[in-house]
């Protein structure tokens, strides 16, 4: 699907702006209705003056989205350009964020988590088949299509995605709690970084807190570099061995041994009937509330400081390390891996 930029003097001649939905680093998202129809879109409005020096980021996002058509991926429907703005008309999803929906449920089981992860795996497997690496998979980028109970899950936010022309990528980027060890070490990396992030997400979906978690950023990254995490009691006592085996294959430190999306889709926890059906909502929702509602999950991440501390720990030799330009957009901190939350 080729979407050419449509030039317009005034976007209000194309869409009626209904209300503000949110904002990003250099854009605002509004609910808009197409003139002459009842069709609604999420219109991403990007001032050109805010784009100076960042044009490649938006062009990359458009290039990636133009190639994608999948039922579990938020679609780019149109691109408009005015003298002052660039506008991306995105498919409107109305079901809310992943964690919010889990908290609102009447019950939640391991089978529900398996179904969610399977949908995301299918979408990411599709991206990988096109040579696209998302590079920023995290719960905030997983949205429900509708408010209904049977709604599908959607993958969003392709601002850091990359079309992998060769075998490997080199620029370090992503959100620290979800980045793979090879990315932190600034080794050449590929699609396996998305699988690692899905391992982190799967872990959280089953207990409500992350596998790598510390108040100290250097310790957090040291844990990731060592792939050091635990299935803590009592939080994991009622979770199946199949689920734990699945997560171990996704959080494999060696990207060559880590599952691909296709291998993950074939694992019995996804494709079979090994996921338990007992209600874990109480425990999971309590931990999500404690671990993800706090502002320290959103604070800015200082890549330069991280590199300095990690080198002191001897994890990355001098002269190597993550790119200080693209290292990350946000950080989280909290508990040590292997420790249950203490509040």
From Swiss-Prot:
Function as written in the Swiss-Prot or TrEMBL entry: Calcium/calmodulin-dependent protein kinase belonging to a proposed calcium-triggered signaling cascade. In vitro phosphorylates CREB1 and SYN1/synapsin I. Phosphorylates and activates CAMK1.
Domain Protein kinase: 15-270
Mod. after translation: Phosphorylated by CAMKK1.
Protein's recorded name: Calcium/calmodulin-dependent protein kinase type 1B
Similarity-based family: Belongs to the protein kinase superfamily. CAMK Ser/Thr protein kinase family. CaMK subfamily.
Positions annotated to bind ATP: 21-29, 44
InterPro entries: CaMKI_beta_STKc, Kinase-like_dom_sf, Prot_kinase_dom, Protein_kinase_ATP_BS, Ser/Thr_kinase_AS
Record comment: activity regulation: Activated by Ca(2+)/calmodulin.
Main location: cytoplasm
GO terms, biological process: signal transduction
EC number: 2.7.11.17
Keyword terms, alphabetized: ATP-binding, Calcium, Calmodulin-binding, Cytoplasm, Kinase, Nucleotide-binding, Nucleus, Phosphoprotein, Serine/threonine-protein kinase, Transferase
């Amino acid at each position: 699907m080729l979407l050419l930029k449509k030039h317009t003097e005034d976007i209000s001649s194309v869409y009626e702006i209904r209300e503000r939905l949110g904002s990003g680093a250099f854009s605002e998202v509004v609910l808009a209705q197409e003139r002459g129809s009842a069709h609604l879109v999420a219109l991403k409005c990007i001032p050109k003056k805010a784009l100076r020096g960042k044009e490649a980021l938006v062009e990359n996002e458009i290039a990636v989205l133009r190639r994608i058509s999948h039922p579990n991926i938020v679609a780019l429907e149109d691109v408009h350009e005015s003298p002052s703005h660039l506008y991306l008309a995105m498919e409107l999803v109305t079901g809310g964020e992943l964690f919010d929906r889990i908290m609102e449920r009447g019950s939640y089981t391991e089978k529900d988590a398996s179904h969610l992860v399977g949908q995301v795996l299918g979408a990411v497997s599709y991206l990988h088949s096109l040579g696209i690496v998302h590079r920023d998979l995290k719960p905030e980028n997983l949205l429900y299509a509708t408010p209904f109970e049977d709604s599908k899950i959607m993958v969003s936010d392709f601002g850091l995605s990359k079309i992998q022309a060769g075998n490997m990528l080199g620029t370090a980027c992503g959100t620290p709690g979800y980045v793979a060890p090879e990315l932190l070490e600034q080794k050449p990396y590929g699609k396996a970084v998305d699988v690692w992030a899905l391992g982190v997400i799967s872990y959280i979906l089953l207990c409500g807190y992350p596998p790598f978690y510390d108040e100290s950023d250097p310790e957090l990254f040291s844990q990731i570099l060592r792939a050091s995490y635990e299935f803590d009691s009592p939080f994991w006592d009622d979770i199946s061995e199949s689920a734990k085996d699945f997560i171990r294959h996704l959080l494999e430190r060696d990207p060559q041994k880590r599952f691909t999306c296709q291998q993950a889709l074939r694992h019995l926890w996804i494709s079979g009937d090994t996921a338990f059906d007992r209600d874990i909502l109480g425990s999971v929702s309590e931990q999500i509330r404690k671990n993800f509602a706090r502002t320290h999950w959103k604070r800015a991440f200082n890549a330069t400081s991280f590199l300095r501390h990690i080198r002191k720990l001897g994890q990355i030799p001098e002269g190597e390390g993550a790119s200080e330009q693209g290292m990350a957009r946000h950080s989280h901190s909290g508990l040590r891996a292997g420790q249950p939350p203490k509040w």
